[in-house]
Amino acid sequence: MSELKNDRYLRALAKQPVDVTPVWMMRQAGRYLPEYRATRAQAGDFMSLCRNAELACEVTLQPLRRYPLDAAILFSDILTIPDAMGLGLYFETGEGPKFERPISSLSDVKKIPKLDPNDDLGYVMNAVSTIRRELKGEVPLIGFSGSPWTLATYMVEGGSSKVFGKIKKMAFAEPQTLHLLLDKLADSVIDYLNAQIKAGAQSLMVFDSWGGVLSPRDYNEFSLQYMHKIVDGLIREYDGRRVPVTLFTKNGGQWIEAIAATGCDAIGLDWTINISDAKRRVGDKVALQGNMDPSMLHGTPERIRQEVATILEDFGTGNGHVFNLGHGITPDVDPENAGVFINAVHEFSAKYHK
C-alpha cells in the first residue's frame, strides 16, 4: 500500500508535532454536496450506496476533491452490524432508520447470530480496501462503528427515538438481557473494526451517539464499560504503524476523564464543552477532536472564521488537536461555507505549531 503523503491526522492523534492542525468533518461525504446527491440517486437508495464498493469509494473521495481535508472516513452506516444480524433494516422517508424485527426479550438476544465480518459484512471490507487503494496514500482512512449502547438503542427501540423508553425499561427491568445484548455487540464491534484494519483502515472511531441520554452511573454501566472492552480488543498496531482509536460520546463532556481512562488515543468532543476545559481535565493522556457546532456553518464566512480562531485559541499551543465539528455536517449547509471552515483551520492554526 502507498506510503502516506499527509500523516498530520495520525501525528496529531499520537500527540506528535504537526505544521498545522489537521481537520476533517463528520459526515463529510454527505447530502450537502450535490455530487453526493447525484451518486446516491445513481445507487437508488442509501443502503445500495453503502453496499456498492465503487460508489461508496466515490462518495468517500468526493469531499477530498473539493477540500484540503487531512483524513478520509469510510462511507457506511453505524447500523450495518444490526442489519447483518437479521433485524431487517429499512428506511422510511423523513423518519430515518427502522427495524422490522426489533429486540424485545432475552430469547431475541439469544437468537442473535455471531457475525463473520468478512462474510456477513464483506461489502464494508470491499469498500475499505477499494477506498484505501484509490486514496493512493494521499491521506489516512478512518474506519468506524457505532458503540454497543448506541446500536442497542436502535435495535430495541426499533429505530430512532427521542425518549428511549423501551431500552431504558430493559436497562432497569431486565438488566441481564441488555447486558447480554451489549456484550454480544461489543464482540461484534471488535471483530468488525479489526476486519476494517486488515482491509486498510488506518484509524478507528467509535460513535456513541446516544450515550449522553444516560445518567453518569448508567453511562458507566451500559455504555462506557463496553467501549472499554472494545478498546482492549482492538488491533493497536498493524502494518508497522499504531492504529489509533477515537471515542465520541455526544453530550459526553462530563465524562471525559473516564473516557480517557479506557486507553483510547483520542476523545471526540461535541460543542457543549469548552475545548480548553477538556484539555485541562485530561492533560496529555489523550488527543482531542472537535468541536465546532455544525450549525455555525450557516453563519457568514467571517463568523465561521471567527469561531475557528476562537476554538484554536482555546486549545492553544501543544500537540494533540484534530479539528472537527461537534457532530455531523447537516444536509442544508452551503458547500462554500464548509470550504471556508477547512481553510480557516489550516490558515489560523500554523502559529500554534511553530
Curated annotation (Swiss-Prot):
* First-tier enzyme category under EC: lyase
Q: Which GO terms describe its molecular function?
A: uroporphyrinogen decarboxylase activity
Subcellular locations according to the entry: Cytoplasm
Give any single GO term for biological process.
Answer: protoporphyrinogen IX biosynthetic process from glutamate
Q: What is its EC number?
A: 4.1.1.37
Report the SUPFAM superfamilies cross-referenced here: UROD/MetE-like
Q: Which InterPro entries match?
A: UROD/MetE-like_sf, Uroporphyrinogen_deCO2ase_HemE, Uroporphyrinogen_deCOase
Q: Where is the site Transition state stabilizer? A: 77
- Which cellular components does GO assign to this protein? cytosol
Which key words tag this protein in UniProt?
Answer: Cytoplasm, Decarboxylase, Lyase, Porphyrin biosynthesis
**What pathway is it annotated to?**
Porphyrin-containing compound metabolism; protoporphyrin-IX biosynthesis; coproporphyrinogen-III from 5-aminolevulinate: step 4/4
Q: Where does substrate bind?
A: 27-31, 77, 154, 209, 327
Q: How does it assemble?
A: Homodimer.
Read off the NCBIfam families from this record. hemE (TIGR01464)
Q: Briefly state the protein's biological role.
A: Catalyzes the decarboxylation of four acetate groups of uroporphyrinogen-III to yield coproporphyrinogen-III.
Q: What is this protein called?
A: Uroporphyrinogen decarboxylase
Species this protein is from: Pseudoalteromonas translucida (strain TAC 125)
